[in-house]
Amino acid sequence: MNPHAKLISIMSLALGTSITISSNHWILAWTGLEINTLAIIPLISKSHHPRAIEAAIKYFLTQSTASALILFSSMNNAWSTGQWDITQLNHPTSCLILTMAIAIKLGLVPFHFWFPEVLQGSSLITALLLSTLMKLPPMTLLLMTSQSLNPALLTLLAVSSALVGGWMGLNQTQTRKILAFSSISHLGWMIVIIIYNPKLTILTFIIYSLMTSTVFLSLSQIKVLKLSTMLISWTKTPMLNSTIMVTLLSLAGLPPLTGFMPKWLIIQELTKQEMTPVATTIAMLSLLGLFFYLRLAYHSTITLPPNSSNHMKLWRINTTPNTPTAILTVLSISLLPLSPLITTLV
């Protein structure tokens, strides 16, 4: 991809995200979402592979549909109440349409089918952007309107996402699809608490972004796209594979790693809100995700006997130190002792 085109796309992503998260008017927020959509499409299709082109088309169709629904929801609310302010979403039909639109944007169940396919057709770095940065604008809109939305509907979407994200990730062999279903499952945890404690949703999103960035950057460094390739990478980069294993366990939410903190706080908050059945259900559903995280961790640390490979130049792996990955790894596995301080700040 042309470096200038890549720079323009990245700058447009930053611009679109900034516009959406800082605006109070629906038209400005919609404009930022559209800039984001148009900026990420060249990054998805940069390899010119048929799968990448297909992923870009799927992404464009789903995101444009969701953006149209957001615009329709805001116009319907303005027609009924005379308000274009994002926080003044009071019309019930507008609230329902907006919930559906943001569910499509985020890839929540039952509007999740596009997300694994788009990630599978993208490079690892583009998949990282789709899993973290591109979730930020719709999540911001959801945070700003959460007090107007239906709690029962959001809880249903959250529990369904945790169930489907864990269940459909069990049988996957492609790392990008596994991480896509991981993202859907984590979104369920964020959505279930968004009405009762929005700051906890922000904390969960930040920690999820840290852990997911670590995994994607590490996989990109050792050029692993599927489990069978991960099996033969241990002998070449044992230290990096070890950090991937620990980060995956953190992503699964095992103590004493960082990923345990948001799940613990969410279950605690749900119990305070007298939603113990929901807390129990979503905690049990996280065991499904734990299975495929352990599967990934297991594949990252076992070795195969010497065998021939069809991959060209597989042994030529860049082993230069990667400072961002190292910093993200430390944050992804060691923040749990600081949880009292973090919760105080948030």
From Swiss-Prot:
Q: Does the keyword Acetylation apply?
A: no
Q: Where in the cell is it found?
A: Mitochondrion inner membrane
A GO BP annotation: mitochondrial respiratory chain complex I assembly
Which GO terms of the molecular function aspect are on file?
Answer: NADH dehydrogenase (ubiquinone) activity
Query: Which EC number applies?
Result: 7.1.1.2
This protein's superkingdom?
Eukaryota
Q: What class of enzyme is it?
A: translocase
How does the entry describe its membrane topology?
Multi-pass membrane protein
Q: What is this protein called?
A: NADH-ubiquinone oxidoreductase chain 2
Gene encoding it?
Answer: MT-ND2
